[in-house]
Amino acid sequence: MLAGVLLLQIWLKCKYANVQFGEHGFNGDEFYLDFYINENFSTKQFAKIESDLNSLSSKLEGISQKFVSLDEALSFFENDQFTKNLLKKSNLNKFKITFFENKHFWIEDLTLTFIKKSFIKLLNVSVNYFLGDPSQLQLQRINGIFAQSKKELEQLIKENEERLKKDHRSLGKQLELFSFDPLIGAGLPIWLAKGTTLRNIIGNFVHHQQLLFGFNTVCSPVLANIELFKISGHYQHYKEDMFPAIKLDSQAMMLRPMTCPHHCLIFKQKRYSYKKMPQRFSEDSILHRFEASGGLIGLERVRCMTLLDNHIFCRADQIKSEIKNAFNLIQKVNKKFGFIFDRIDLSLHDPKNQSKFIDNPGLWRESESQMENVLKDLNIQYQKEIGAAAFYGPKIDFQFKTIFKKMITIATIQLDFLLPEKFDLTYIDKKNTLKKPVIIHVGIIGTYERFIAALLEKTSGNFPLWLAPVQAVIIPVNIQKHLKAAKKLYNKLLKENIRVNLDDNQDRLAKKVRQAIIEKIPLQLIVGDKEIENLEKLTCRGFKGEKITRISFNNFVKRVRRDG
């Protein structure tokens, strides 16, 4: 995919000497490139550009790559303020620069061997602020598909068309679930009424399962003194992913990226006996993480999120049973939503990367061994992922493959011996001495944002009746004649706790029916002359075109309650 980025950069540089490049990357089979020039592109130009790009790949003689220092890289891009900014923001010591003729390009993960013969299809052009910051200049973004044969390109285009139908970003707009606005900021989702209802339905189900599992609900602030995150180690190991500190009353405060430090302090409010262990806390936690703007993908990766967070404080002899129970809880809850995970990872630390993980080899050996033994006891197939652990401990990650063929983590179990040490957490054991508990972090469905993104892609927005934000829509045939009866039916259904809308637009019946289909509302109730005479008998139609049926009001309510 990055070969497509290079070809587009070369074409732009040859045509516009002063072009400047912003972020680039790929999602599945689709690449994108941000750039700044004093000319606006349109899709009408794509055919000519595609022809130029496809012929360009055969003319790349003499192309080469070289690793250089930051100072040398900056000198190559002296007149490109955006690339210079990106170079400075990266954490790299060496930079892979690609040279072609007298031009140079920075595409860090590019492999030249893939550029032999190209077939490119450009998909769209849009505008966005550099790094998602409204105070910055607007850049143009071109998305495209790169292939090495015509047959492959045709297949990728076909797959892309199918993906668009399932893309959670377009479905979110179509179903009026969520939106984004540059005045609020990149990666900061706005939940609309239907999306908020969907969140509440999901949350209510998960909260009930948490209660059955023995979790106590707590609530803690989104802000904390910077010292809290220094004690926990987040400031040292996670600072680059946290929002900058805010100065309040001469104190440095930070938006939390995780809830565990807060829950450690909640546990510390009381001295527990070994008989009262484990202690299980749950919270719908609002978190803020400063994700790179180029990595923001709809709800899948955002900067403000709500995590259904759970922490188990237990004795060492309870670790295995608590992890097994948490594993089964995750499977049970996600099965209700139709999820079968594509992969389960055992995420381990990388002993060569001491800056990313705590330096305690003995602790890592013990915690990683315990996690692996649990997976073996459960007879679970898993894949080891070196370097994917949390900085404080190993994880079991439940992975879902998106429509862009990218694995994302939906649920997780993490084992943590570190934070009890950091916060000096203790309980009283049988011998009346103080012992350190162990923390098990459990994300049953992860964040609402990512879970709903995955749910939309899995269902194409066709939610089962129990999960649909709007279960039924009432459609009066004629506003003048039938609206009064439709309103009466609407109020009757509301009293029965049915999630129902009333379409009181002046449009023709056929248009209202089409709109209900677009919004994927499971049931349509048509109110005409028959219903005016008797609202105890309803005319019902499924949005997928099921046969129109006559059903009593009571049986309709029973059906919705049964299936919903």
From Swiss-Prot:
It is an enzyme of class 6 (ligase). One of its GO terms (cellular component) is cytoplasm. Its EC number is 6.1.1.3. InterPro entries: aa-tRNA-synt_IIb, aa-tRNA-synth_II, aa-tRNA-synth_II/BPL/LPL, Anticodon-bd, Anticodon-bd_dom_sf, Thr-tRNA-ligase_IIa, Thr/Ala-tRNA-synth_IIc_edit, ThrRS_anticodon. Gene3D superfamilies: 3.30.54.20, Anticodon-binding domain, Bira Bifunctional Protein, Domain 2, Threonyl-trna Synthetase, Chain A, domain 2. PROSITE patterns: AA_TRNA_LIGASE_II. GO terms for biological process: threonyl-tRNA aminoacylation. It catalyses: tRNA(Thr) + L-threonine + ATP = L-threonyl-tRNA(Thr) + AMP + diphosphate + H(+). Zn(2+) binds at residues 260, 311, 441. NCBIfam families: thrS. HAMAP family: Thr_tRNA_synth. This is Threonine--tRNA ligase.
